[in-house]
Amino acid sequence: MHLPGCAPAMADGSFSLAGHLLRSPGGSTSRLHSIEAILGFTKEDGILDTFPAERSSRSSKERDPRLGAQPACPKAPAGGSESSPPAAPGFVPEYEATRPCYPKEQGEARPSPGLSVGPAAGDSKLSEEEPPKKKHRRNRTTFTTYQLHELERAFEKSHYPDVYSREELAGKVNLPEVRVQVWFQNRRAKWRRQEKLEVSSMKLQDSPLLSFSRSPPSSALAPLGTGPGSGSGPPGSALPLEPWLGPPLPGGGATALQSLPGFGPPGQGLPASYTPPPPFLNSAPLGPGLQQLGPPPAYPCAPAFGDKFSLEEAYPRNSSIAALRLKAKEHIQAIGKPWQAL
């Protein structure tokens, strides 16, 4: 036995419309929600004919899980009264017709129409109670002249004062002990930097390259002929060269060399009993190989060092230094004058 309006409605697809009001056995009224009802379509539009009845009923059950527990066709109540007549097919509630349809994903909770979508009440309370924390910035301590004077005096006595000394000093200069401790730490760091700078500057001053590059004063070089009047360079040269690096001076060097000890003629300063050895290269017993070689070639030597006045007059107390410089001069000239290009 079929109830009127139940099986025919399911057959022609009109069972899924939103306007049907069903009365449950308990007497409460329930409303069916389907995709067509949410979108606002009716049977008269002609769109519902393309969907089968089973598909529309299955989609309505998926959208509203309450339909799964209800029977497809509710039974009539015990009193034998029939179900109330269905409402007009074209009647669609306004809130359902304007609400868009969003597909429900798995694990996603759809909010109820009566609840507002937004952050939870607990989160809003926490955000109101906990304002954003500001970064704590310590104010810089400004020391007075008296405080700096007392701190410097204490630093001269000891770079690492103990806690008792710091507390006593803090009470004396009216500062917290923590500020005094921080000041000593900064002062020790500054002292270490100063020590490193002093050590590095002393090493640079004592290096041989810098001592060699330093030129002697012009007053000491002028008697040796390196001044503008000696003809060794252009007048007014900014960087005078050392005496053994300059070009030789013309003429008159023999008298200056003979005045120094050890630079006299070959026979001077020798005892009377000394006899020079015979020249073995010119002797007869030499073999033919040595005779073909002949005497050794004479290396070109620069003209003798000369000056208008003797070195003893220029350096009355530094004759030994002048002699050493002259020996170095002759040694460089004998090598081949490599420094004259300078």
UniProtKB/Swiss-Prot annotation:
A motif (OAR) lies at residues 319-332. GO terms for molecular function: DNA-binding transcription activator activity, RNA polymerase II-specific; RNA polymerase II cis-regulatory region sequence-specific DNA binding. Residues 44-140, 208-295 are annotated as: Disordered. GO terms for biological process: brain development; camera-type eye development; hypothalamus development; limb development; pattern specification process. Belongs to the paired homeobox family. Bicoid subfamily. CDD domains: homeodomain. Residues 55-66 have a biased composition (Basic and acidic residues). It is found in: Nucleus. PROSITE patterns: HOMEOBOX_1, HOMEOBOX_2, OAR. InterPro entries: HD, Homeobox_CS, Homeodomain-like_sf, OAR_dom, RAX/RAX2. It comes from Mus musculus (Mouse). Residues 208-225, 235-244 have a biased composition (Low complexity). A motif (Octapeptide motif) lies at residues 33-40. Keywords: Developmental protein, DNA-binding, Homeobox, Nucleus, Transcription, Transcription regulation. Plays a critical role in eye formation by regulating the initial specification of retinal cells and/or their subsequent proliferation. Binds to the photoreceptor conserved element-I (PCE-1/Ret 1) in the photoreceptor cell-specific arrestin promoter. Expressed in the photoreceptor and inner nuclear layers. PANTHER family: HOMEOBOX PROTEIN, PUTATIVE-RELATED, RETINAL HOMEOBOX PROTEIN RX. Its main location: nucleus. It comes from the Eukaryota. This is Retinal homeobox protein Rx.
